[in-house]
């Protein structure tokens, strides 16, 4: 059992994803043609003392939005405070924007300026993120070449791996999907959060013309 001090610990509860068709890819419907094999994805749950931020965006290779979700939400001190339905204080957002700064020679962001606009009154909200460290999502099965999600390995299979974070190949496909622990600022507020990113294939707004890497 691990005890967390609510005065020093912040967190975000993700929803249940249920059963996901990840092993072997989603075989439903016709496959996408190679020209559309690209994805730009950002997800940023951020925690401040008095509020939380939810920012999610999918865009195509030209930077056109495919899906976006955004909100400013109240922060809760205890589980007992969580509402059964949506809190009426939740403010929904639209018109997501982003400006990322990347590590040399890779697509991994070290800083990000994100913004969106409130649906209720049109006010624009901007927040700045600075990377503290990077977590490689292949460590929990995302795009791992051998131990991907849902891959059947028999009745009992066990393995372990170690990676030297100083020499990880940032050009490799399995290392593109990351979550960065970020120091976040929103006006006078300073908080903590995560920026999850995945950018594969061409992406015109940042000049990416290959499958991975800065220029492919």
Language-model segments: what does each one mean?
Residues 1-216:
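Structured soluble/peripheral alpha/beta segments that form catalytic or ligand/cofactor-binding pockets
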């Amino acid at each position: 059992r691990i005890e967390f001090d609510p005065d020093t610990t912040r967190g975000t509860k993700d929803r249940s994803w249920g059963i996901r068709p990840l092993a072997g890819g989603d075989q439903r419907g016709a496959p996408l043609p190679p020209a559309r094999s690209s994805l730009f994805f950002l997800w940023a749950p951020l925690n401040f003392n008095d509020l939380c931020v939810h920012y999610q965006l999918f865009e195509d290779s030209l930077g056109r939005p495919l899906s976006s979700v955004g909100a400013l939400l109240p922060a809760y001190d205890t589980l007992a405070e969580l509402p059964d339905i949506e809190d009426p204080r939740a403010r929904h957002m639209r018109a997501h924007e982003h400006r990322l700064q990347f590590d040399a020679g890779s697509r991994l962001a070290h800083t990000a300026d994100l913004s969106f606009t409130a649906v209720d009154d049109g006010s624009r909200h901007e927040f700045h993120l600075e990377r503290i460290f990077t977590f490689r999502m292949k460590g929990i099965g995302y795009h791992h070449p051998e131990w991907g999600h849902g891959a059947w390995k028999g009745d009992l299979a066990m393995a372990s791996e170690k990676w030297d974070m100083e020499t990880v190949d940032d050009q490799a496909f399995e290392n593109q999907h990351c979550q960065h622990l970020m120091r976040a600022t929103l006006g006078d507020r300073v908080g903590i959060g995560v920026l999850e990113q995945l950018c594969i294939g061409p992406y015109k707004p940042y000049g990416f013309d290959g499958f991975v890497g800065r220029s492919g």
